[in-house]
Amino acid sequence: MEDDTKIGLDDAYSLKTPADNVALYRNWAETYDTEFARDRGYQYPQQIADIYSRYAGAHDVPVLDVGSGTGLVASTMREHHAIDSQLTIDGVDISPEMLEVSKKKNLYRQLFERDLSQSIELPKNHYGAVVSAGTFTHGHVGPEALAKLLPLCRSSALFIIGINGTAFDQYHFGSHLAALQADRQITPIEFVRVTYYASADDDNGADQGFAAIFRKASLYTPDP
């Protein structure tokens, strides 16, 4: 019998405000890795980490994991770079409870509780890469946050940004990314399709998205 009290995607996709996000993940944090990620075969974070491993060079550190949650992206990154002492990852998330779960895993150098819909108070010109899975989606973070991440990064920083497939069109991610490229803030964008789940058989089981891969332009000079 279906457990009607179990938190799921319908709850996550119906969120309206940052406060809604905080409330949902307060109640979901302790069971997220098992009742959601494990039971659904949630492979999206691993795919984002795999793409980072394929595209990143030695200079693409430290890494900022945006919407880091319980640390699923960082966990796979650590597996790929088990002997790489240079891999430094910071995490940022709106949920203190999710951050507390990830803190226990010892994956991150630092963890920051931040609302990405507001000004992002983090070190400027610091990061060599940004990764994200499950954050740019329905009820969570829109494309406006992308421009806010650029000042946090050094020139030529690598971005691996996962974006929900239907949210991509609904919230006009394509036009926002195109505007950043036209303004010479980012390099041309490559899109790689990602499949979210390996073992989910409900209405969202076949959900897909895109990983947007680009770099912060090395010589960004705004038009006069």
Protein language model regions, located:
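Conserved class I S-adenosyl-L-methionine
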Residues: 160-185, 189
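A short glycine-rich, Lys/Arg-flanked "PGG" loop and its adjoining helix->strand segment in the class I
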Residues: 144-155
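Class I SAM-dependent methyltransferase SAM/SAH-binding core
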Residues: 64-120
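Core SAM-dependent methyltransferase catalytic element
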Residues: 200-224
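Conserved SAM-binding loop and adjacent beta-strand
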Residues: 34-49
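N-terminal, positively charged/glycine-rich alpha-helical extensions of SAM-dependent methyltransferases
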Residues: 1-31
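A short SAM/SAH-binding and catalytic strip from SAM-dependent methyltransferases
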Residues: 128-142
